[in-house]
From Swiss-Prot:
Protein name per the record: L-cysteine:1D-myo-inositol 2-amino-2-deoxy-alpha-D-glucopyranoside ligase
Gene name as annotated: mshC
GO CC field: cytosol
Binding positions (Zn(2+)): 25, 209, 234
A molecular function (GO) term: cysteine-glucosaminylinositol ligase activity
Catalysed reactions listed for this entry: 1D-myo-inositol 2-amino-2-deoxy-alpha-D-glucopyranoside + L-cysteine + ATP = 1D-myo-inositol 2-(L-cysteinylamino)-2-deoxy-alpha-D-glucopyranoside + AMP + diphosphate + H(+)
Motif stretch ('ERGGDP' region): 165-170
Sorted UniProt keywords: ATP-binding, Ligase, Metal-binding, Nucleotide-binding, Zinc
InterPro entries with a match to the protein in the record: Cys-tRNA/MSH_ligase, Mycothiol_ligase_MshC, Rossmann-like_a/b/a_fold, tRNA-synt_1_cat_dom
Keyword Zinc: yes
Keyword Transcription: no
Subunit structure: Monomer.
Length: 397
């Protein structure tokens, strides 16, 4: 399995030693799952499946940021309890992922339940001299990590430009370095808080993922995944925390990042409101397999724009594939399956994999000539391969 590694900017081969270990950053559950989310989780589901199909056991961990500023702000705005909102949207997310046939993580871990882990990690960082206080908040000093910047490959100027757009506070008085990040936010009026050795408060965003990953996966796990908007500051900060807490051990071996999905000319995001929700499509009786196929038509690392036409093309494609699969016999399946597996092993190239299926369907239906039905078991073999490798369940009732 070769994946493009963000820090090295090249494809590297993942070589799991024992169970493959995967961490993908999860949602902040204050709204429904949109197609940008779905694209990321479908992509890393391909990795999970590829490892499993290659015979590896897989330990897959995903967090849910079930306490954070956006969640608290949304709960206040719509006049619901923040816990109720988080639980409702988390359950909807799980339903959406199940409909898209994303294999659930082995450990799906909330920030709130992980607060003891976060406190323990902050204590280790404090012992290492990497923590300081600004009023009631605790900050991580990025200079404590000699390798800071290696994960993103960004220079300081670019970091400072982007940091305030992604939750950072570079201009706060009292900070030692503008890029330092909060690891413990002291109690604010009207906000939930938990006791700690440094006073009541709640975790910072980055440190929760570090604590969860270290507890459930250990150090130097195989792949850290997420969207490209997490390269900096999130994954850079997570790596910094981990590498100061456990010197000499990298946080992850490979960092793999998916592209951004746009809609109406801009990145799909909750703040802009230009969202297409998986649940809304499902409630409109759209076949979830068509949604998944529409996502798979794009390479996961590419930025791309969603259009409704793509969905309807996928609906038609699924119908055409099912028609070919209903025949039983078809064009030889073995070379098609080999091509699908080879494509996915090459940086999760789902467009190449689905194109191989298109060619088999065309040959089987005789779209461009005589129908090829020389393989009597083609449909059964391809149905199983589509399910196992691409997560497309096209079994005929």
């Amino acid at each position: 399995m070769a994946l493009h590694d963000t820090p090295s900017a090249r494809k590297v081969t993942t070589t799991p030693d024992g169970p493959a270990r995967l961490y993908v950053c999860g949602i902040t559950p204050y709204d429904a799952t949109h197609l940008g989310h779905a694209s990321t989780y479908v992509a890393f589901d391909l990795l999970n499946r590829a490892w499993r199909n290659a015979g590896h056991d897989v330990t897959y961990v995903q967090n849910v940021t079930d306490v954070d500023d956006p969640l608290l702000e949304r709960a206040a705005k719509v006049h619901v309890d923040w816990v109720e909102l988080a639980e409702r949207e988390t359950e909807l997310f799980r339903q959406d992922m199940a409909a898209l046939r994303v294999i659930p993580p082995d450990h799906y871990v909330g920030a709130v339940e992980s607060i003891p882990l976060v406190i323990e990690l902050i204590g280790r960082l404090e012992t290492a001299g990497a923590i300081y206080r600004v009023e009631d908040d605790l900050y991580f000093s990025v200079t404590a990590d000699p390798a800071f910047g290696a994960e993103s490959g960004w220079d300081r100027e670019r970091m400072l430009e982007i940091y305030p757009e992604r939750g950072g506070d570079p201009d706060r008085p009292g900070k030692k370095d503008p890029l330092d990040c909060v690891v413990w936010r002291g109690r604010r009026e009207g906000e939930p808080s938990w006791e700690s050795p440094w006073g009541p408060g709640r975790p910072g965003w980055h440190v929760e993922c570090t604590a969860i990953a270290q507890r459930h996966l250990g150090g130097a796990f195989d792949v850290q995944g997420g969207g490209s908007d997490l390269v900096f500051p999130h994954h850079e900060m997570c790596a910094g925390h981990a590498q100061v807490a456990v010197p000499g051990t990298p946080f992850a071996q490979v960092y793999s990042h998916g592209g951004m999905v746009g809609y109406d000319g801009e990145k799909m995001s909750k703040s802009r409101g230009n969202l297409v929700f998986v649940s809304a499509l499902r409630n409109s009786d759209v076949d979830p397999m068509a949604i998944r196929l529409a996502l798979l038509r794009h390479h996961f690392r590419s930025d791309w724009e969603w259009t409704d036409d793509q969905l309807w093309v996928a609906v038609d494609d699924i119908a055409r594939w099912r028609k070919a699969l209903s025949l039983g016999a078809g064009a030889p399946a073995a070379p098609v399956i080999d091509e699908v597996l080879a494509a996915l092993a090459d940086d999760l190239d789902a467009p190449r994999a689905t194109a191989a299926i298109d060619r088999w369907v065309a040959a089987t239906l005789g779209t461009a000539g005589l129908a090829d039905t020389t393989d009597p078991d083609a449909a059964a073999r391809l149905l199983a391969a589509l399910d196992a490798a691409l997560g497309l369940a096209l079994w005929l009732s």
